[in-house]
Regions:
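A structural signal for multi-pass alpha-helical bundles of membrane permease subunits
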Residues: 2-282
Length: 282
């Protein structure tokens, strides 16, 4: 009896949390179908009648949605590949090799996670301006070619604790020796053994990086001044005028902007959940 009551309470709490999390999405979709008068109506309109689907068409045309989506896709995919690959290599080096100053470097890496990236914005902007890289995606990619501290730490922890822990019941030396006997070099061990076995964590890292790049406004707004080069998150700002804001179009554009990320998550949900579970188990 006591267990059944606790079970019911658990589901009630989960249901309430789900409602709290879904309300913003409902309000976003509802707002994307409103006109200006419905936005300012009192009491608020939750189910707009009539529904103004023209907000989606107007947003698509006014902000150059197709070009902006392509820009975001190119930037997000390139950023994800660079960060995941470089972070995985750095994590492999920290977790597998012994070299002078290793612990000091790793402590510096952890300390750098505590610093806001915005403090380097002005020096980086001045440097990239002298290199004539403004209005390209290079300033948003080059600083991350050596890996992002958080993802280096995440992948390193996976390699150290899970990969060489209870998963394979073998020491790193034994695994490496077996691979070397088969003729594998250091990079071959990484690509053919460590990489595939770290797939769940790599996918989690890739998803987090893709989402960050997709929604980035700070760096995109600083380095991409030309409208034809701007990503979708920056183009949304063009709907904010000096005297008015096109709320309906902005909400409609936000809904369309979210769809690729939601689709990506559902396609990779299995690996994402597995990677999160592994991270928790460590």
């Amino acid at each position: 009896m006591k267990k059944s009551i606790l079970g019911v309470l658990k589901w009630i709490i989960l249901l309430m949390l789900a409602i709290v999390m879904l309300v913003p999405f409902f309000w976003l979709i509802s707002s994307s179908l409103k006109d200006k008068t419905q936005f300012y109506s009192n009491p608020p309109v939750y189910f707009p009648i009539p529904m103004h689907f023209e907000n989606f068409v107007n947003a698509w045309v006014n902000i150059g949605f197709f070009r902006a989506i392509l820009n975001s896709l190119v930037f997000a995919l390139t950023f994800t590949i660079i960060v995941v690959f470089s972070s995985a290599l750095a994590a492999y080096g920290f977790s597998r090799f012994k070299f002078p100053g290793k612990k000091v470097l790793f402590v510096i890496l952890l300390l750098s996670m505590m610093l806001p990236t915005q403090i380097m914005t002005i020096p980086l902007f001045l440097m990239f301006k002298k290199l004539n890289m403004i209005n390209t995606i290079l300033p948003m990619l080059l600083p991350y070619c050596l890996g992002v501290p958080y993802h280096i730490f995440l992948i390193r922890q996976f390699m150290n604790i899970f990969l060489y822990g209870g998963a394979i019941r073998a020491t790193p030396e034994a695994l490496d020796e077996a691979a070397k006997i088969d003729g594998c070099g250091t990079m071959q061990i990484f690509f053919y053994i460590i990489g595939p076995m770290s797939t769940p964590t790599l996918i989690v890292s890739a998803l987090l990086n893709f989402i960050w790049a997709w929604k980035d406004v700070w760096y995109s707004n600083i380095y991409l001044g030309r409208p034809e080069r701007q990503t979708i998150s920056v183009r949304l700002l063009s709907l904010i005028g000096d005297k008015s804001v096109e709320y309906g179009q902005m909400m409609a554009a936000t809904v369309m902007m979210m769809l690729p990320v939601i689709l990506l998550y559902f396609c990779a949900q299995k690996y994402f959940d597995e990677g999160i579970t592994i991270t928790e188990l460590k």
